[in-house]
Design a protein with these regions (language model features):
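Sec/Tat signal peptide C-region and signal peptidase I cleavage site
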Residues: 5, 15-20
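Hydrophobic alpha-helical membrane context
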Residues: 14-15, 61
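Repetitive, compositionally biased segments used for assembly/scaffolding
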Residues: 20-137
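Sec-dependent N-terminal signal peptides
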Residues: 6-10
Length: 137
């Protein structure tokens, strides 16, 4: 679940997420939600229990678990966001192209998935093979 949320928010950093966003699995079932309050984005599971947060920095976000312990960071430069673990080691990158499609890569540069937003504002997440994983609206 933590890894899943990390991937989601790496994308949302690019997308300038609206005040509230709901996540769904590939079957359309709600899996969680994200709510922005100033420079903080709070994460909730499907039952409304807070699971963590993201706090804006000068060039990205820091992530925290529900107890407030730092779990990682995301630093954005141009169209690329790099994810680091709590120790500062690179975990992966997220790159957005001119069409607005964000592709995720692991620390070795291998593609792990992508995110595409349609005209209605719904973002769909795909795995590395192009299969739908979930969506966000």
């Amino acid at each position: 679940m933590k890894k899943f949320l990390a991937v989601i928010f790496s994308f949302l950093i690019f997308a300038n997420v609206a005040f509230a966003t709901t996540s769904y699995d590939k079957y359309g079932q709600k899996t969680g939600s994200y709510r922005q309050n100033g420079s903080t984005i709070n994460l909730y599971d499907r039952y409304g229990q807070r699971t963590g947060s993201f706090k804006k920095t000068s060039n990205g976000y820091n992530s925290y678990d529900k107890y407030g312990a730092k779990t990682g960071s995301y630093k954005t430069h141009g169209n690329t966001t790099t994810k680091y673990d709590r120790y500062g080691s690179k975990v992966g990158t997220y790159k957005t192209n001119s069409s607005g499609v964000t592709t995720s890569y692991d620390k070795y540069g291998r593609k792990t998935g992508s995110f595409k937003t349609d005209s209605s504002g719904r973002t769909t997440q795909y795995d590395r093979y192009g299969r739908k994983v979930g969506s966000y609206k």
